[in-house]
């Protein structure tokens, strides 16, 4: 009888440990997602400045006598602007979608997520990494263009 009680107690402790681990997992992933967002959000200003700079450079080249080299630079600058604008849009779209999927308590206070929302959060974690890569990549490309 004592063995059964001890076994039952161990099973309960094990289940409780699994339960608390699951509770920690979602807030941890939520924090990771928000950390990526918080890291790239300040770069939105950089994107705006680079769009303006590349457009200014492109406009000055459009006033010059056309050559093959100038045409290539104009195309590259246009590509850079397009890349920056797409990255910016990706961030805005991600924020809108993310905010529509989760409540403020879930995002800011770590409120427990149901299975469906955990699945959505896993998808959002992938999307936020893609968005981060698009932002960083477009900024790096634009900075290279602006220094030529």
Name what the model sees in each region.
Residues 1-4:
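Positively charged n-region of N-terminal signal peptides that target proteins for export
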Residues 14-17:
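C-terminal motif of bacterial Sec signal peptides marking the signal peptidase cleavage site
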Residues 19-65:
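Immediate post-signal-peptide N-terminus of mature secreted/exported proteins
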Residues 23-33, 63, 67-77, 111-121:
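Alpha-helical rod/repeat scaffolding segments in eukaryotic adaptors/tethers
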Residues 27-28, 83, 93, 134-137, ...:
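Subset-of-secretome marker
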Residues 36, 40-44, 51, 110-148:
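C-terminal amphipathic alpha-helix
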Residues 51-69, 98, 102-109, 142, ...:
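Secondary-structure edge/capping motif, primarily at the C-terminal ends of alpha-helices
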Residues 73-124:
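Long, amphipathic, charge-rich alpha-helical segments that form helical bundles/coiled-coils
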